């Protein structure tokens, strides 16, 4: 916090965990494979809430901690205080795919998509909102970089279409659920001035 005190961990039988620090440890390669697995298990235990739309940004700290940015200016489940923040969830998925945790990355992406497409829950036009609140309602449809990160992750990690020194490289990481009934999955995109349909 602003006073140099540890923020995450166990406090009075309450676990405090934030997704942001975990994402950057995974994405940067700082966390080794065993640590990434431990992060996944902890995130599933303490941050994942399917009804709210996926991975919450943090657990409930059960206090108003005003020396930690603006997050505690909001009730738990809103904005930076415990909402399912789409951008960070997609970055979590991207980091997991990069590190080979495909099933875990898929879960993060798919839960966001399922919630956004469930109008009775999200109450928002299909798309990725800035965040889902405690009830799973999508908030602020156009105030997020999550959509571009979602597309980046689908193209470069899920379908595995990347450029490398001018060459087109394919390294798909699709899971069974992403294929249709005929066993097909495909993507159409532009690369080096050409249009490709990859199936």
Give residue spans per PLM region:
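Acidic, mature catalytic/reactive cores of soluble proteins
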Residues: 1-199
């Amino acid at each position: 916090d602003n006073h140099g005190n540890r923020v995450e961990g166990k406090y009075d039988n309450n676990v405090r965990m934030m997704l942001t620090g975990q994402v950057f440890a995974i994405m940067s390669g700082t966390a080794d494979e065993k640590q990434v697995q431990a992060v996944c298990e902890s995130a599933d235990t303490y941050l994942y809430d399917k009804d709210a739309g996926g991975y919450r940004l943090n657990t409930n700290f059960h206090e108003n901690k005003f020396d930690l940015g603006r997050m505690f200016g909001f009730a738990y489940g809103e904005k930076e205080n415990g909402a399912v923040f789409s951008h960070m969830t997609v970055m979590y998925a991207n980091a997991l795919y990069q590190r080979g945790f495909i099933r875990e990355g898929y879960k993060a992406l798919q839960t966001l998509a399922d919630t956004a497409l469930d109008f009775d829950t999200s109450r928002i036009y299909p798309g990725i909102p800035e965040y889902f609140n405690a009830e799973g309602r999508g908030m602020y449809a156009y105030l997020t970089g999550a959509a571009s990160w979602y597309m980046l992750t689908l193209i470069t990690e899920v379908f595995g279409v990347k450029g490398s020194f001018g060459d087109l490289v394919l390294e798909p990481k699709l899971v069974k659920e992403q294929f249709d009934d005929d066993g097909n999955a495909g993507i159409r995109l532009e690369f080096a001035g050409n249009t490709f349909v990859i199936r």
